[in-house]
Amino acid sequence: MNRKVLALLVPALLVAGAANAAEIYNKNGNKLDLYGKVDGLRYFSDNAGDDGDQSYARIGFKGETQINDMLTGYGQWEYNIKVNTTEGEGANSWTRLGFAGLKFGEYGSFDYGRNYGVIYDIEAWTDALPEFGGDTYTQTDVYMLGRTNGVATYRNTDFFGLVEGLNFALQYQGNNENGGAGAGEGTGNGGNRKLARENGDGFGMSTSYDFDFGLSLGAAYSSSDRSDNQVARGYGDGMNERNNYAGGETAEAWTIGAKYDAYNVYLAAMYAETRNMTYYGGGNGEGNGSIANKTQNFEVVAQYQFDFGLRPSIAYLQSKGKDLGGQEVHRGNWRYTDKDLVKYVDVGMTYYFNKNMSTYVDYKINLLDEDDDFYANNGIATDDIVGVGLVYQF
C-alpha cells in the first residue's frame, strides 16, 4: 500500500472504529454496514489476575434509511465476545452498544438506547492508546461516564449549520437501580446491578469547538440522582465512620480537554472531577470495593504516525481519590484521606500492515506504591502489565 495513503488512512481508523466497515447493502436510500475485529491479545504481568490470554472478538452494524429530504433514521448495534474461555462457559459476551434514532438535517439528531455518555465525548480524546488508557475515571455503566444504557441523546454539529466547528450534545438518563426491597423508585429495571452501577435520573451536556488547524477544545458535565441503595449504603457507612462508601444524594462529573490532530501528530489532554460515583477496588462498589467521595483525574497522550505504518505512543494517567475510607493502621482511624487510585506511564507502539491488519505492544508502567497496604486491602493491582496483540478488523 502507498505510504502516503496509509498515513492518511490510519488516523481515520483511529477516530472512527467502524470507518473500515464492509458495506452490505446500499440501495433506495437504505444503507447497512457491517464492522468487526478479532484481537489476539496476551497480557504479561506478575499480577495473576491480569496475566494471561485476553483475546476477544467484536462485531457490529450501522444502518440508516432516508425517510425524506430532511429526515434520516439510523441505528447501531455492537457486541463483544471473549474468546479466552472454555466453550459453554457463561458470562463471556455482552452488548456494548444498541440504539436507534432520527437525524433532522442541520437541526441535529436524537437517539435512545445503550450508548456512550456525554462525558465520554471529551474522554475519547485521550482514550487512544493501543490497549490501555482511558481508565482514570471512565467506568462502564457508571452514570454517563462511558457506555451506559437508558440514555436519550440529542447531538448538533456545526451549531445548526451556522457556526462551523461548534458542536454540542444534551443527554438524559433514566433510572437504573436494583429491584426488590429498598429500590424505592423507578421501574426496578436494574436487575442484579452492582451498587456502583445503579443510577437515578440524570442529565448531561457536552460542547466542543474544532479549529481549522487541527486543534479542538471541549468540556462536559453531568449530574444525576443517586439510587436509594447508594444513598442508604453511604449513610450507614458514614454512621460507623468507615467512610468507604460516598454519601450524598447527587452524583456529578465534569471534564475539560484539548486535542491537536494534524501533520501526523496527535496530542490530547484532559482533566476531570467526579463526586459520589467512581468505584475503586473489587466488587463494583460491593464486597471489598468502595465508592469515592471525590476523584481528581488527569490524562495526557502523545502519538506520531509514520508514513510506513508505525505509530508510537506515550501517555501519563493519574486519578487521586479524596477523603477515602478504610483503617489507616498507624493513625488508628478509619480514613486514608487522599490516595492515588490510578497512576501509570504508558509506552506503546502500533504497526499497521494495511487497513485490515495491525499489531501492537503496550507497556503499562504502574506507579502505585506496592508497599502501601491501601492497595492490597482494596484489591487494587500495583504491578506492571505488557499487552501484545495481533488485530484483524473489517
Swiss-Prot record:
It comes from Salmonella typhi. One of its GO terms (molecular function) is porin activity. Homotrimer. The keyword Signal applies. Forms pores that allow passive diffusion of small molecules across the outer membrane. Gene3D superfamilies: Porin (2.40.160.10). Residues 1-21 form the signal peptide. NCBIfam families: PRK10554.1 (NF007841). GO terms for cellular component: cell outer membrane; pore complex. It is found in: Cell outer membrane. It holds the Pfam family Porin_1. Keywords: Cell outer membrane, Ion transport, Membrane, Porin, Signal, Transmembrane, Transmembrane beta strand, Transport. The keyword Signal applies. GO terms for biological process: monoatomic ion transmembrane transport. InterPro entries: Gram-neg_bact_OMP, Gram_neg_porin_domain, Porin_dom_sf, Porin_gammaproteobac, Porin_Gram-ve, Porin_Gram-ve_CS. Residues 222-242 are annotated as: Disordered. Its main location: membrane. This is Outer membrane protein S1. It is a multi-pass membrane protein. Belongs to the Gram-negative porin family.
